[in-house]
Amino acid sequence: MDLTEQFEASIAKAKGLPSQSNETLLELYSLYKQATEGDVRGEAPSGFDFRGAAKHAAWETRRGLSSDEAMQAYVDLVERLTAG
């Protein structure tokens, strides 16, 4: 199975995970966005949009990570979450 197939399988697995911490959800979100869209673009949402600002900040931490690196990190994270 190539990396793209592993990534797609991990996305499906992640949807079936039990409830996760906000930190873990932001990590999954940021890796997914970096893998599928690349570096974050545009301005951060208003500080009053706490959820949007947190998502933007999490994605920003992945700046410079290649699509393949982000996919692999996502696959690894989902594997850790489903193993335990």
What are these model-predicted stretches?
Residues 1-84:
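A charge-rich, low-complexity, intrinsically flexible signal that marks solvent-exposed coils, linkers
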